């Protein structure tokens, strides 16, 4: 009886080891899947990197060698151009990806010393001011960016110009802005965002089309990625 039992015992142990060998590797991907599932929309350092914390302040200036433009038409080149501009946002929600992160845009500035105009009769640019802040900004996993003003208001911008007849203010409004976030350069780009003139002299063009690329978007010194 003992002689016949030993082989069965060895067979049982061998079968148990085989089952364990097949079972243990399957548990490893489960851990990896959980880690991927916990990745938020915004991270720093790399895709799937360190989560951006709620309350973190993100900033970005114009991409190197580019300018923010405010042209009279989507296909034209007449208008205002600035080589120095910056925005600042505070992160208010950063859910698990895929999803949509929410930010509060607290500042969007243009350095008037970097701005020029090629509009006939305009001698220079006194400044560009963004009104009705703060705006709500959303960034989705697919790269879609939407900038929305407070309820009942608009994205409002005043372009102050020096002319042959003195200083004039051209005031423009848009219901919202849409852009695209890219991990290539950690950028946010706005292309031909249409504004409508609500006040200003005849030297102010009827519509303004805003184009700019901001990069890199950073959290402190770390580049921000969209997941």
PLM feature segments, named:
Residues 161-167, 173-203:
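Extracytosolic low-complexity repeat regions of secreted or lipid-anchored proteins
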Residues 53-54, 59-63, 144-158, 186-192:
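Generic recognition of long tandem-repeat/solenoid scaffolds
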